[in-house]
Amino acid sequence: MHKAPIDPNSGIWDKYFVYPLAMTLDWFAEHLWGQYGLSILVVTLIIRSLILPLTMKQYRSSKRMQELQPEIRKLKEKYKNDAKKQQEETMKLFQQQGVNPLAGCFPLLIQMPVLIALYNAIMRNQMISEHTFLWMQLGSPDPYYILPLLAAATTFLQQKVMSTQVNAQMKNLMYIFPVLIFVMAMNFASALPLYWVYSNAFTVVQSYFIYGGSRNKGVQKLEKSGGNR
């Protein structure tokens, strides 16, 4: 995989983030018939489940901001010739409604180090790079392009399920991201696109309950199971 080996003594990042995740992957593989492909699945599900409360918090913040959009548009129209007054009144509205416009960013910022650490734990684990799962060598690109296709397809599904929550410009990206994922997955060691497939599939199911047809019921179920922990 051409990555530096994981050394718990090399710094805080490896010691407290990457190394524990790598050891967790090894432990699950040992208890799952030596299958690192299954270990990556289990660890991905655990991490995504643990950050589910953050995802729900991000959703609630986004939903509240959407509910305020009519009022925000009125303020923009009313003070279209006075940018300073428009900003002041908008912030006043946020304060009155108890909304922090940056609140939706905080969960994402917290999630990113964990997900990057998981990426490093997978890509820098020599045991994973030498392991074979199903038809693929986890340390080498998929020669049959099955995994890149699955990664691209699940990325598209993820974007499709969440498309109702983004603007028209962002919707155009739902056709670009899968292509980029396919190209990258063609050249990356199979362990990484395998993680993408698992993570995307989790997001598709999660997003269906959050954003899908049974929106309110799904949110209530998720909040009861994980959103308020």
Regions from the language model: what does each represent?
Residues M1-R229:
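Helix-loop-helix
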